[in-house]
Amino acid sequence: LMREIPGMVVINPSDDVEARAAVHAAYDHVGPVYLRFGRLAVPVINDREDYKFEIGKGIVLKEGTDVTIFATGLEVSESLEAAKMLEKDAISAEVINIRTIKPIDEELVVASATKTKKVVTVEEHSVIGGLGSAVAEVLCEKAPTKMMRIGVNDRFGESGPAVELIHKYELDAEGICKIIQQVQRRLSYRRIWQSFFA
C-alpha cells in the first residue's frame, strides 16, 4: 500500500544497526518516508566497519551462483541461514538485503538475476504489493528471469506470537530452504527430460 503513494520512500531494516541508520537517513531525506519494523528480535548482520546505509541501495551479503534470494527486514537473517542449509545440497545461493523497497536498487536486482538466472524474494508481508512485486516489475521490464515469491499468500493475517507465525507461513530458514529445494528439483527434472528428448 505504501509503495503506491507518490514520492513515498519505503524502508524495511534487517536489524537494529540498520534501523538506527535508516532513521538517520529518513531524517535527512527530503520527502515522506515509511519505516517498517518487524516484531522479532533478530541477529545483528550489519556490524562491519564499512557498513553504510543509503536509500535506494541494496547490499550483497553472500555471493552465490545458482539462485538469488532477495530478502527484506527480518527475513534477511532467515535467508542467510537458509543459504547455509542449501549449501549442504550443493545449491549456491546469493543473498541480497533489499533494505529500501522503494526506490528499489534496480541495477543490483538486474545484475544478480542475470548472474544466477533464478530469483526468490522473501518477505514477512503479502506477496502482493511488496518486495516480490517490486522485484518482479524490474525483472519483467529489464531482465526476464525465473522467479518465485515467498511471503504471505493472498489471505488475511493472523494474530499470535511472531515466531509461531513465521514458522506457520514457512518464512523461517527451514521453510525458505525447503521451498527453494523443491523449486530447484523441479527445474533439474525439467532439464533432464529436455536433454533426454533433445
What feature does the model see in each segment?
Residues 1-28:
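Conserved thiamine diphosphate
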Residues 35:
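Divalent-metal (often Zn2+) His-rich catalytic cores of metallo-beta-lactamase-fold enzymes
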Residues 38-198:
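Thiamine diphosphate
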